[in-house]
């Protein structure tokens, strides 16, 4: 696709909107998705909407940054510093970004059973999934694994959070939960557990055994990804929870 052409000059079957209607959004390049939001082009060299979308990504990706990571937190003023992006285009982009975030912020209805990592992630997403700082949170459950609530225990830096078993269990007991799932986020989006994550999980499982409050899982979330430590470790075999 030629980025200097107007959308009207591109063959119909190659235009982003028509390709989305025919093949679905997954086949479109990121610049094409942005082009649909922009509607029109311009900027340096009178770019097409697709060209302007590509140029925007290049500008956001300067200094070896991930352009999509920058886009998630960009401000209107920052977008409008890019040639060709005025208030109308900036607000369209930011509205789409916010809508995308909110689709990950669905919370189950009260008393919904949490019967899978996916259900737990849905309940925790608003607190953890897109945060810039590491957070540690708990899902508070009743004896039938029904959701009583969520609670953020600690907020750390961009690279670490501090959570102790004492703080975690104190909140669980205070809230009257009889079962729990713990979770934290990795702002980088890499949801592989660190040695510290494994050790904390070990301590929590041992504490849960002593208190008789089953720990059902430890989840790591970040940038749309998640990982269940129960699914990828043998810790629950070492510390059975009676669940």
Curated annotation (Swiss-Prot):
Keywords: Hydrolase, Metal-binding, Metalloprotease, Protease, Zinc. Zn(2+) binds at residues 184, 186, 197. It comes from the Bacteria. One of its GO terms (biological process) is proteolysis. The keyword DNA repair does not apply. PROSITE patterns: MPN, UPF0758. This is UPF0758 protein alr2351. It comes from Nostoc sp. (strain PCC 7120 / SAG 25.82 / UTEX 2576).
